Amino acid sequence: MSPARWDLPPELCCRPMAFVALTGLDVVYNAIHRAIWDAFCANRRADRVPISFKVLPGDHEYPKCRTKRTSYEWYIPKGILKTGWMNKHLNLVPALVVLFYELDWDDPQWKEKQSECATKVEIVRTSLQGRNTKVAVVLIQKKTPLPPGEDLVASERASALCGACDLSGKSLFVLPHTDHLVGYIIRLENAFYEHAQTYYYNEIRRVKSHKEFLNKTTHQLLFVRHQFKMGFFSELKQDTQNALKYYRTAYSLVHELRAHETNVLEIKTMAGFINYKICRLCFQHNTPLDAIAQFRKHIDLCKKKIGSAELAFEHTAWMSKQFQSFGDLFDEAIKLGLTAIQTQNPGFYYQQAAYYAQERKQQAGQLCSHEPGVGYPAPDPLETTSGALDFYGQRPWRQGHQSIDPPDSEKEKQGILALQVKERDVLHSELIIALLSNAVAQFKKYKCPRMKSHLMVQMGEEYYHAKDYTKALKLLDYVMCDYRTERWWSLLTSIVCTALKCSYLMGQVKDYITYSMELVGRASILSEEQKSRIEKNLIKVLMNEVPEPEPDCDPVSVKAAQSLWSDRVSLAGNNEFTIDVQDYVPFVQCKAKFLSPSFHIDEPVQLHVYVRADCPHPVRFSKLCVSLSNQEYNQYCLLEDAYKGKDILEPSSQENMCLVPGKTRKYCFNFVAKTEDVGKKIEITSVGLMLGRETGRYVYLNWRGGWGDAASSHESLQASRSFKRRTRLPEQHVDWDAVSVQSSTMIISRVPKISVQLTHEPPALTNEMFCMTVTIKSEEDTVGKDIKLTAGLKPGQDANLTQSTQITLNGSEVCDDSHPALLPDIPLGDLQPGQKIVKPLYIRCVSTGSRIFLFHVAYSVSATVEGKDITCKCHKDETVTVETVVPFEVAMKFVSSKFEHLERVYVDIPFLLMMDILSASPWPIELVESEVQLASSMTAIDQPQSQVEGVTLQTSECASECFLLKCPPVQNGTSTVASGHYIISWKRKSTFTETSVVRTVITLPHVMVENIPLYVHAEVPSFGRVRESLPVRYHLENRTGLVQDVEISVEPSDAFMFSGLKQVRMRILPGAEQEMLYNFYPLMAGYQVLPQLNINLLRFPNISSQLLRRFLPSRIFVKPQGRNGDASIEAA
């Protein structure tokens, strides 16, 4: 029985489209006709109407229409649906026949061609005798027709042609062969589509009209048939909603049929067809839940309709095909835009289809295992006269039989036998693998890794049963990683057993060794007997012998495998294998560890390797080697059996090279590190354990990183989380779970035996030469040679700090930018035991902030390790954080002679520069000297001398000094000029060390200088006395090149009487000076306001009187009158 027998017919699975036949086109020899045909069928877009076109000759014979039945009273149907009915209406019986005929309206032979066209139409009608198929005529014309109504000749001849051909006006079309051919074709298609819809509508009505003649006693099959036909015609009409309604009715009716062994296959077949149509339309209507519900209902209704027990495999084959077909529909809908999810995707249906295919295989094995003498029956009961069945789902030897009992029991037996024999020849594994492959692809697409792995295991097992061991092993090996990672030990054991059988039957030595080691180990759930058998086979392979066959293997395959293994044994080469155990769970475990995360160069590096076996019997290894990142040390980490030629089963002279099951062996290695490895990490790259002999066959178990297989990480985690109290083991025994892994170690320098002391007085002051004394004292037993000091700013800090820090050994010189921030490798010579070296360093910090300074002392000493003389390089680092602060803050301001703040100064008018020095240092500061370097735009009235020289300031104390200055004339009326620099020489007062003088230069602020036209100043005594005359002389100096007209008035004061001009107007020549004398008579004692002088410059109205008199004193101290005037005057 061919698998194709269960495939759905292609006419059921395709999308039904209206069938339109085109006649009168010579597409081979006529280029115009070919262009018309290409426009109809080539590169059709999705938005064009769904029509299936076919070019047929004009005299084509269409299927004959049977005589219509007038009564169904005595009619008994022989089946539900004929096998050729769907194809007939899809490809054989057209809804419309279109006759193409070349004829122009102005053709000179119009009459003859009109008659010829009518004849061709009549021929088509004759061939369609009894059919309701429409006929239409398309005139192929060379000219573009005029708009309707304008060409009277065309209208008349069109009417005449319709009359001659017996056509309605809607069935006659004109097709001009112009550049716009495709546009005309699309318009024709739309018209053809309307005619086709009318045809299928009439067909539905015709089928529906039969219902009144039917009864439910004898015509149950016809009810199903008619509903199916109406649904199919509705699909051809593209009325999918009504089609779904008819199909649902048909599905209900098909399950109302009385089922028995002779017709159950036909019922299931038609139910499957109708279910397929319903599900397809539900997906098409974007109602996937309805499709799924319908399919589940379909399976529930049909899964128990098995039929003949002798043909039970047919039922499982049919069930498998149902799931596969629905999976195909689901997948097709997804490709068209439907969204699926993890829990509902086509993979589940393909998986179920594979399950039924596996059941089919199992049932076929039970039902089709005939005796060797039983062959295929003759004559063939499955042959039919036509080569095909008349009705879907019927038996070839009893077509049309609808009664409960078979007509001929002998034929029934022969037919069943023929089906069983054909089923025996079916390659079930191929069917199962194809379905599982589809399911795996879907679960991979929807990210269901466990489902994917599960099905891949089934595929591997199916390949194994199909004797395709290569593919089976490839698939099983792929999924083993997942099961190892997730620790499904029972599943993994089953998979590895199958893989072991495959590797044995293929003669794959390495795979056989690998899987044997895993099945013998702790992850396997096999019994001790099975493990023991596998271990013995493993030892045989390592001894280059042929292993015993695995149980339950195909005898023919075993025989071939034994021949393969014999060839493997006879081969001299290819006997060395390496297995990376990280991907497996072998029966040997390993942990390698350094005893410390770091070792000093003057002590040996110690390494322990722990090995444990989980196999049933003791096993001996021949070599254990540790590979380190520095391969020069590998020679010290090697354990080898001295007697390499001995047999693997013979006892070894080295007892510790035999691994006893469940007992942990410890192997110790040590070596002396090289001095050039100081500061480097040494890592365990791998540990190798050799089973077998180099003279024969051997396998290297390789642990990358020195420990661990596919199960070790989880076991270590479980052990660390366990609250189980560990039993105390004897001293010589090792608790495997208590062994931790240390796969790398650092070689560090020898512990230095020197002391480094730093002496300094923090914080550092900006720009000073900050002294830091380094004292190095030796505590070594031998001479420290080649001592070098690296001192300065610790690397890795802010780049700005590096640029603003300088260090030197010479404290007498001031550092500049040429000095580095770090002095490397300062040679200090040798250091005897107990000797001390003192080294002062001077650091200049230009900016404030916190800095970390490093003092690195390196030297070398001689030492003996494990009898080897080595030179050890030692070093000691000391760091210190030093804060840098400003020593003082300088406040500068310009004031007038009355000590009023000035925002601007005036040409040749004296003013004061005030300097306030506030100490911010926690240490006393001595001000050695100060000076003012004036710019050319400013001069001193007298020789400026330092007023703070020798002053010592404590924290927060302030020293002040002032300088009397004036500005010479400027070019413009107003300008901003530089003042110069203020230079302070200072030093820290320290009892710790002699400090150097620091010279700090401070830039004085710029000041705005203005010219003033009239300078007014006064000569006033330092004080006055009540009721005594107080002479005041005012000087008015013209500073311009113009004659100044000046108005002067005196505002009286309540505290004074005065004599002199109260109001005067005068003229002052350029550069001249005018004096005015007043006698003031004080009336009250104390600080009194002098009478104010109001000055008005007529040539400079913008100059205010207030500006001019700011240079004049406004108050004076008046003493009270004494009892003895002379004595008081002398006292004053």
Curated annotation (Swiss-Prot):
It comes from the Eukaryota. Pfam families: Foie-gras_1 (PF11817), Gryzun-like (PF12742). GO terms for cellular component: Golgi apparatus. One of its GO terms (biological process) is vesicle-mediated transport. InterPro entries: TPC11, TRAPPC11_C. It is found in: Golgi apparatus; Golgi apparatus, cis-Golgi network. The keyword Transport applies. Disruption phenotype: Pronounced hepatomegaly accompanied by lipid accumulation in the liver. Keywords: ER-Golgi transport, Golgi apparatus, Transport. Belongs to the TRAPPC11 family. Involved in endoplasmic reticulum to Golgi apparatus trafficking at a very early stage. Component of the multisubunit TRAPP (transport protein particle) complex. PANTHER family: FOIE GRAS, TRAFFICKING PROTEIN PARTICLE COMPLEX SUBUNIT 11. This is Trafficking protein particle complex subunit 11. It comes from Danio rerio. The lineage of its organism: Eukaryota, Metazoa, Chordata, Craniata, Vertebrata.
